[in-house]
Amino acid sequence: FKNLHQKGKFALMAPTGRASRRMAESTGVDEARTLHSALGLCTGEEVGDGERVRFVDADLVIVDEFSMVDMWLAQQFFKRIGQHTRVVLVGDPNQLPSVGAGNVFYELIHSGMVPVTVLDWIFRQSKDGLIAYNAKFINEGSTKLYYGNDFVFVDSPTQIETARRIQDIYCKEA
């Protein structure tokens, strides 16, 4: 975008500080912000009908991890972007939906109202690893899974025992 539009403004956003920092690191752009910060929602004040909104001054806005965005935050975002601003929403519709109300990213993708591009290149896990392999099976509705060093099944009789075993495994790995 910077190469094509030297005078164009763009904004990088994500729902969490961790995701925005990772976005900044992976793009080499220093100014990736949380949605709350970029939208002026960090004051702790309730946002009512008469609020003074901070509009996003950008020609292009890219929001990563959009599957984590609930209905309220999505509404705040969409009412603060300009009519001619291009928006790219990045996320995984197969991840757990937002903690708050709504499965906004999934619904947008399946609405047929917005163009969708599916990226099938795996960045965070080994392409040949069992996590990616099993994720594909799970997304297809299959229960046949493969186990190995990077994908294990921990059987336990109770929730408390499950938590203890997970903690033990985590401490050994860390």
Report residues per predicted region.
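Conserved RecA-like ASCE P-loop NTPase motor core of nucleic-acid helicases/translocases
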Residues: 1-27, 88-90, 151-166, 170-174
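Conserved catalytic network of the ASCE P-loop NTPase/AAA+ motor domain
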Residues: 4-5, 53-55, 79-84, 109-113, ...
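Short glycine-/polar-rich loops that comprise or flank the Walker A/P-loop
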Residues: 8, 58, 83-86, 112-117, ...
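Inter-Walker segment of RecA-like/P-loop motor cores
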Residues: 8-60
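Catalytic P-loop NTPase motifs of RecA-like helicase/translocase cores
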Residues: 39, 68-70, 96-97
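Walker B catalytic acidic pair
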Residues: 64-66, 91
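Short, conserved "post-DEAD/DEAH" coupling segment immediately C-terminal to helicase motif II
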Residues: 71-85, 103-108
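Conserved helicase motor core of P-loop NTPases
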Residues: 93-174
